[in-house]
Amino acid sequence: RTGQPGRDGCRVPIPWSGSAPPFGFGPGTGQPWIPQPDAWKTLTVQAQQDDPDSTLSFYRRALAARRSLPADEVSSVAADGDVLTVRRGALSVVVNCGSSPIPLPAGELLLASGPLDGAPAGHLPADTAVWVHA
């Protein structure tokens, strides 16, 4: 071994179904060698399937939105303090990585990674991303 930390902490099997480890990962009685926390029962695909506020539902909405948009090239990527903005044609993805709300970009809101009502009107809350179509 190299003595360097491994990547095992970020390479845990996807929790598919059930209410206990291994959450539907793998056939039979085998167990993954990377442990899965018991708390993951709420994060299985099965548990998120019908929840409109789940991470799975968010990713499905993001994929549907992306398929509906033109396949333009990325025209710019900008980091300004705690804000990351990626532009692709008329689409802007703005990520507020900071701890304070920022003004929302103008345009049609296509997708938000979280509720926007936790910030003043017209602002993007902290730790939230939006897709906006100009």
Predicted regions located by residue number:
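Loop/helix patches that line or flank the sugar-binding groove of alpha-linked glycan CAZymes
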Residues: R1-L91
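C-terminal beta-sandwich/jelly-roll accessory domains of carbohydrate-active enzymes
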Residues: C97-A134
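Buried hydrophobic-core signal for structured, non-transmembrane domains
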Residues: S92-N96
